[in-house]
Amino acid sequence: MDIPMDIRALSQTYERDGYIGGVPILSPESVAQHRASMEAAEEQIGSLHYKSKAHTILTSPLQLATDPTVLDIVESMIGPDILLYNVTYIIKEANAPSHVSWHQDLTYWGLSHDDQVSMWLALTVADDVSGCMRMLPGSHKHGRYDHEMTEDEFNVLLQGQTARGIDEDK
């Protein structure tokens, strides 16, 4: 899929907001193929939810992570030296009571430097009804928030970490 991108604009957006969103990366057909691959793998080996390093045993997650468009976007954020650390499926089906609490990826994943990024790539429709990702533009400029462990059974995050002091109005 050939996607015209202004890499400089992506970089500026990342600097300003702390994230880049709404960039079409895959064709609908490619998304369907990757979703089917994930579901086929689950039929064979069980749930992939929060199985770390999925890219080391399945080709589909490695293909997603090394897609040229994905790499261009990541390069616009952190430069050309890119190392893939982990691919994890975080499965949250539409209309389920599950949710992802407010958190900062660097803290959640135990990363120490802000030259590391996480990429969320939806393999299903993600909108207000189905439960899309929410971000707080510019929150990365406020430093790291304290996180607390919670026992919220509907929190999709493995450790239940929730950032304290989040003001959604900012």
Regions found by a protein language model. Give the residues of each.
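Active-site region of the double-stranded beta-helix
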Residues: P80, L106, L123-C132, H140
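Non-heme Fe(II)-dependent double-stranded beta-helix
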Residues: M1-L111, H147-E148
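Short, conserved beta-strand element in jelly-roll/cupin
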Residues: H103, G110-D128
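Double-stranded beta-helix
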Residues: D128-K170
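A generic membrane alpha-helix/interface feature
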Residues: A36, H99, L121-L123, T150, ...
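Hydrophobic side chains in beta-strands
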Residues: I91, L121-A122, M135
